[in-house]
């Protein structure tokens, strides 16, 4: 039996329902309405997901979480939207809690000798409530899985675990929380660059000193992870995806992905699986939860999420001191760079036979790290630019190369990969312009496309 405890939330979800098609005897039924539902969140959600695999000892707050007061447990709110045969989160609406101080969290937890204890530390008070901690972490020797959120590496619980259980502690955190903590880790350039940045931060950033002698799993979006185990570092990655890709492509947002990762990871750990398999299962479960969303009830689709690990997820050992030249493709014995290059040129890219990181920008495909980082940098600029509804200036990019090198093709494919529905391609051959009026006419075409609500990459 696994014990799960930690910060508990009550997660309210609401979704709209159409009014009656026929005129109802009650006026309110003729108008758009909303339904609401309270779900167990935080540690209770992690426990519920783990029950899909094994027996779980967890806190109890009663049968009706919606009847709890915000002074007792933090309440969160999210508005859903229909997507397919279920729902995704349209908007996270915020939280409510006690007017001052910490929530009281009046839950009960049965004492049980568990080989594994999972602590969901969301930074909402549990870390300071020693009276709520399971007695095993005070005097026993269990394996402890700590799912920690910002603010990181603070509080009585963290200090206690570092002092009493460093050898039996596995910490699960996110790259975004590390960035918020001050770690300069680039986002969405290449898997190699992310890994190199992480290694540098672990070696040089004093705020991460506590992690250097621990076993740490850093979740990189929903697409990858890094396992840092007392200096031995492994990177887990989806070869065709980069950090944030799944979130960008999903029909909406989703909550509970961190709990899904932790539950799948811990379940595999309890089965005696190797760390690689545990992490792969965690990545797979979190990604599937985002893809599936809430079920039609709506509720968490637990039976649809926890399956075998995605066999496309690659794993590679990160060198101790990478210096900007390291590539996954050059990591023996996984890859022979010459054979891999020859295979791609002759046969094209095959996920099964060649699990290299590959970037897809529309019809443009590249497996070269430098090209990936260059294209991703430009694409990131485009994404940020298109988030601005009323930019004052155009985004200007200079592309150089001989005729026929694919300059226009590369730019158009990059733009199309950002938001194909809003992109309207406009190509102008300046060498054919006869006078200044031709240039003015080109600018007018760009203006007209903008007035239509489109984003026109004007290639001159």
Q: What annotation goes with each model-predicted range?
A:
Residues 2, 394-398, 458:
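Residue-level preference for the first positions of well-ordered beta-strands
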Residues 70-73, 83-85, 400-405, 416-453:
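AAA+/P-loop NTPase substrate/partner-engagement loops
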Residues 390-410:
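Walker A/P-loop nucleotide-binding motif
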Residues 413:
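Mobile, glycine-rich extracellular loop/lid and propeptide segments
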Residues 99-111, 130-135, 436-460:
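Conserved alpha-helical scaffold flanking the Walker A/P-loop in AAA+ ATPase domains
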């Amino acid at each position: 039996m696994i014990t799960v405890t930690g910060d508990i939330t009550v997660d309210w979800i609401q979704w709209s329902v159409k009014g009656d098609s026929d005129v109802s005897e009650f006026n309110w039924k003729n108008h758009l309405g909303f339904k609401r539902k309270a779900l167990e969140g935080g540690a209770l959600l992690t426990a519920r997901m783990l029950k899909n695999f094994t027996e779980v000892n967890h806190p109890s707050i009663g049968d009706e979480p919606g009847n709890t007061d915000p002074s007792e447990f933090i309440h969160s709110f999210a508005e859903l939207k229909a997507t397919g045969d279920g729902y995704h989160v349209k908007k996270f609406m915020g939280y409510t809690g006690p007017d001052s101080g910490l929530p009281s969290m009046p839950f009960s937890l049965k004492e049980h000798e568990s080989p594994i204890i999972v602590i969901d530390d969301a930074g909402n008070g549990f870390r300071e409530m020693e009276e709520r901690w399971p007695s095993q972490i005070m005097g026993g020797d269990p394996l402890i899985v700590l799912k920690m959120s910002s603010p990181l590496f603070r509080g009585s619980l963290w200090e206690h675990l570092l002092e009493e259980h460093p050898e039996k502690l596995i910490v699960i955190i996110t790259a975004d929380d590390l960035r918020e903590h001050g770690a300069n880790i680039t986002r969405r350039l290449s898997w190699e660059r992310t890994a190199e940045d992480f290694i540098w931060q672990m070696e040089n950033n004093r705020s991460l000193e506590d992690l250097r002698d621990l076993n740490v799993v850093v979740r990189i979006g929903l697409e990858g992870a890094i396992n840092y185990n007392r200096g031995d570092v492994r990177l887990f990655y989806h070869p065709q995806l980069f950090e944030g890709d799944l979130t960008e492509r999903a029909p909406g947002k989703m909550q509970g992905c961190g709990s899904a990762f932790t539950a799948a990871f811990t379940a595999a750990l309890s089965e005696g699986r190797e760390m690689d398999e545990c992490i792969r299962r965690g990545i797979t479960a979190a990604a599937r939860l985002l893809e599936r969303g809430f079920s039609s009830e709506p509720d968490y689709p637990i039976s649809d999420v926890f399956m075998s690990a995605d066999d496309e997820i690659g794993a590679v050992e990160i060198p101790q001191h990478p210096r900007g030249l390291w590539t996954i493709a050059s990591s023996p014995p996984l890859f022979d760079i010459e054979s891999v290059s020859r295979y791609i040129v002759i046969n094209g890219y095959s996920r099964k036979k060649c699990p290299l990181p590959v970037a897809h920008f529309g019809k443009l495909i590249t497996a070269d790290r430098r090209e990936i980082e260059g294209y991703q940098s430009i694409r990131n600029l485009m994404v940020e630019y298109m988030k601005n509804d009323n930019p004052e200036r155009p985004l200007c990019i200079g592309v150089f190369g001989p005729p026929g090198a694919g300059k226009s093709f590369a730019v158009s494919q990059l733009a199309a990969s950002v938001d194909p529905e809003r992109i309207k391609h406009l190509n102008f051959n300046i060498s054919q312009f006869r006078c200044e009026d031709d240039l003015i006419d080109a600018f007018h075409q760009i203006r007209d496309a903008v007035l239509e609500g489109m984003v026109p990459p004007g290639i001159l």
